[in-house]
Amino acid sequence: MRKEFLFTSESVTEGHPDKMADQISDAILDYIIERDPKARVACETLLSNGFCVIAGELKTTTYAPMQEIAREVIREIGYTDALYGFDYRSAGILNGVGEQSPDINQGVDREDGEIGAGDQGLMFGYACRETETLMPLPIFLSHKITEGLAKARKDGTLPFLRPDGKSQVTVRYVDGKPVGIDTIVVSTQHAPDVSQERLRDAVIEEIVYKVLPKEYLGDDIRFFVNPTGKFVIGGPQGDAGLTGRKIIVDSYGGSCPHGGGAFSGKDPSKVDRSGAYAARYVAKNLVASGVCDKATIQIAYAIGVVEPVSILVDTHGTGKVEDDQLETCVRQLFRLTPKGIIESLDLLRPIYKKTASYGHFGRELPEFSWEKTDKAELIKNYFNLK
């Protein structure tokens, strides 16, 4: 590893078009799974200038008023006026959802009570000691800024902000550890009558300096706030939005590999989602146990097959025991079949809309069961660690 380097991650606000799509897809999933926990859901959303298309496949016994759900999500985000680029009242919403293919379903719902993986695929989980939530610092800080943008807009602190926005944080590392922030980029949609100077000062003073840890705020940070100038046209009026296009924002900000599968709109029989949650659960518990300082987990599945086809543990040279021993431990202490993951993490709950903005990982909310470190003591005992 290089002695000194810079690493960058980004986040987007809940009003970013891609995140709007994720939230609509997950709100529909929540509505269905609350009423039919055995439902199979694959819900995709497209947003563009003045309209929204909902597509995908379902197998369920319940009815979901998808247009009403979508309008409520758009309203909650803050698109309540056409001047903002989208209006929940007037947007055209098309429902094109169909029935799940029986060819897929036959491999998932098995007669023996097990659940086969809903598709093939590989998922990654990651944890490190850079933050209290065992997340990489650049993505952690980026999310703090975008959350701050939304809060300042909604509580009236900065009433000239609009829903669409992004952040990006570059962190300086020495000997593999973060030592400070090098660059912060914030782009935020705003009212047409606010000056760029006022906007820049307000974002830095009212958001960045208030939400980021003081130990990382030096006088030499480079700030770029709306570096191209005005950002009045935003939301789906400025860019189309699509479910599953912010998978790096959703995960670890590029600090570890990604298997390529998106999360939102998918019920937990889809291992793209549940497998990634399980991989984070494993990685976080390994680091929390003290057996390593950093862990990358890969899990892979075959469609219709119960057991994972492979499990990999990589502690990047920080482990107190060999990685192959950790793999054996993981296989013994964690249930990594689709059914085992669903049951151990209690995933048949309407918890998913909360995951669809500001990251699926590193947020220790009661609903986010994959953030628990309840296996840490078992791992310590397994290796007789003090």
UniProtKB/Swiss-Prot annotation:
It catalyses: L-methionine + ATP + H2O = S-adenosyl-L-methionine + phosphate + diphosphate. Binds 2 divalent ions per subunit. Binds 1 potassium ion per subunit. One of its GO terms (molecular function) is magnesium ion binding. Its cofactor is Mg(2+); K(+). ATP binds at residues 16, 164-166, 230-231, 239, 245-246, 262, 266. One of its GO terms (biological process) is S-adenosylmethionine biosynthetic process. Residues 100-110 are annotated as: Flexible loop. Keywords: ATP-binding, Cytoplasm, Magnesium, Metal-binding, Nucleotide-binding, One-carbon metabolism, Potassium, Transferase. Pfam families: S-AdoMet_synt_C, S-AdoMet_synt_M, S-AdoMet_synt_N. Pathway: Amino-acid biosynthesis; S-adenosyl-L-methionine biosynthesis; S-adenosyl-L-methionine from L-methionine: step 1/1. Its main location: cytoplasm. InterPro entries: ADOMET_SYNTHASE_CS, S-AdoMet_synt_C, S-AdoMet_synt_central, S-AdoMet_synt_N, S-AdoMet_synthetase, S-AdoMet_synthetase_sfam. Mg(2+) binds at residue 18. GO terms for cellular component: cytoplasm. It comes from the Bacteria. Catalyzes the formation of S-adenosylmethionine (AdoMet) from methionine and ATP. The overall synthetic reaction is composed of two sequential steps, AdoMet formation and the subsequent tripolyphosphate hydrolysis which occurs prior to release of AdoMet from the enzyme. NCBIfam families: metK. Homotetramer; dimer of dimers. This is S-adenosylmethionine synthase. The lineage of its organism: Bacteria, Pseudomonadati, Campylobacterota, Epsilonproteobacteria, Campylobacterales. The gene is metK.
